């Protein structure tokens, strides 16, 4: 076979092809290093003897549709200059890998647009071979995110499996990179992050998180000088949960069958942003439901008013709006609203801190959506470390892996 084909297509530069044969549908190239190119693997001397050889097989990039192997005759070298007795270097493969570097690069190229399952089928190798190549690449490029430049971070959780199995992630809000992945969603989930952060803790200026008491306690303990910010996303999300809880309670209490039907069919309209309901029929349906039930109407309009806390021109005006909202919720005597008011009052300082730093968890919620897609792409994950590395590389748009 032409030497340039071996060099350019297969990534083999020092060896010559001695023979070509087929094993079923598979193509096998028999290669070896010419005598004049053999040298000591330690000192590079050509003052050597060959003390035997053996055949080592490598998976190479396919030629056409044929799975291709390289059977290389690897010589044992005895050097007269340095005295070593070792096998010759195989520069087209890494260490004891059974595939060539060119094959690994092809796997990584395919990983930009194909799943592990697709790649393993196309290249006729096992799922684990593809996963291990990806993992080696991820470990060398993403295993130790730089924490020294962190200034503003966000903390959140996501479910790894159905049920209550969670992981905690920390995101650099200035570049959108995941910099830490912790097991579970409690206070201890961040222990590894604090340990890795070390003296760089003093550089953290602000932390955005949800209404989790575990996270707020952990941040207050380890980052006493950082501002803690609770953004509108999680407050609004909690308010929507309270509104839906009230809707279900009212549905169970309502005796009139027709009114029950009206309440049951309005969940989507109640939870949606009122300014986004443009359909005239939907608007009439919502107003009809609210007119039939005063507690539901109060809760709905308080939900709509809640976002005004983040629409003020100053922190002082936002404080006044927040205090007035809490007052109205308490005076309503509606239990879910009173609980919501209690929560907002408890997190008042953190909510208003948004006006000092203007950070939200919007970035991290977008990342959570990417994580859902990632889990589908890899058909679940069989290796915790591999999954974490995939998360660390999630921001790199040039990679599908």
Give residue spans per PLM region.
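Short, conserved DNA-binding cores of transcription-related domains
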Residues: 1-84, 89-90
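Short, flexible, glycine/charge-rich loop motifs used to bind or transfer phosphoryl groups or to couple energy/partner
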Residues: 30, 142-144, 194-198
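Acidic/histidine-rich catalytic cores and adjacent linkers
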Residues: 33, 37, 42, 162-164, ...
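The DNA-recognition helices of helix-turn-helix-type DNA-binding domains
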Residues: 47, 126, 137-141, 211, ...
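Short, positively charged, Gly/Tyr-enriched micro-motifs
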Residues: 57-164, 201-204, 217, 351-352
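Active-site beta-loop-alpha junctions of metal-dependent nucleic acid enzymes
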Residues: 96-99, 178-200
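Short, surface-exposed amphipathic charged segments that create phosphate/polyanion-binding patches used
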Residues: 240-251
């Amino acid at each position: 076979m032409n030497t340039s084909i071996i060099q350019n297509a297969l990534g083999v530069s020092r060896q010559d092809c001695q023979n070509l044969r087929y094993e079923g549908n598979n193509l096998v190239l028999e290669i070896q290093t010419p005598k004049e190119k053999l040298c000591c693997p330690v000192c590079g001397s050509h003052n050597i003897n060959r003390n035997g050889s053996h055949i080592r097989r490598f998976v190479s990039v396919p030629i056409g549709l044929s799975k291709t192997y390289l059977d290389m005759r690897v010589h044992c070298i005895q050097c007269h200059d340095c005295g070593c007795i070792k096998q010759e270097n195989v520069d087209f493969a890494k260490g004891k890998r059974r595939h060539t570097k060119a094959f690994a690069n092809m796997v990584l190229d395919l990983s930009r647009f194909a799943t592990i399952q697709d790649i393993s089928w196309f290249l006729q190798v096992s799922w684990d071979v593809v996963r291990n190549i990806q993992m080696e690449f991820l470990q060398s490029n993403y295993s130790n995110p730089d924490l020294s430049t962190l200034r503003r971070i966000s903390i959140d959780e996501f479910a790894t499996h159905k049920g209550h199995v969670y992981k905690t992630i920390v995101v650099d809000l200035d570049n959108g990179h995941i910099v830490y992945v912790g097991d579970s969603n409690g206070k201890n989930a961040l222990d590894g992050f604090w340990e890795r952060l070390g003296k760089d803790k003093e550089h953290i200026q602000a932390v955005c998180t949800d209404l989790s008491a575990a996270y707020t306690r952990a941040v207050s303990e380890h980052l006493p000088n950082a501002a803690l910010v609770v953004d509108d996303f999680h407050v609004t999300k909690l308010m929507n949960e309270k509104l839906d809880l009230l809707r279900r309670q009212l549905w169970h209490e309502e005796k009139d069958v027709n009114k029950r039907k009206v309440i049951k069919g309005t969940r989507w309209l109640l939870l949606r942003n009122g300014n986004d309901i443009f359909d005239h029929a939907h608007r009439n349906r919502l107003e009809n439901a609210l007119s039939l039930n005063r507690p539901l109407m109060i809760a709905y309009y308080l939900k709509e008013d809640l976002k005004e806390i983040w629409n003020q021109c100053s922190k002082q005006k936002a404080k006044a709006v927040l205090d007035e909202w809490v007052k109205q919720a308490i005076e309503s005597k509606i239990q879910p609203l009173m609980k919501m008011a209690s929560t907002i009052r408890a997190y008042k300082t953190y909510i208003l801190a948004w006006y000092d730093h203007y950070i939200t968890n919007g970035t991290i919620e977008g990342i959570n959506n990417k994580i859902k897609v990632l889990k589908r792409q890899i058909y679940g994950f069989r290796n915790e470390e591999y999954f974490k590395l995939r998360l660390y590389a999630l921001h790199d748009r040039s990679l599908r892996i």
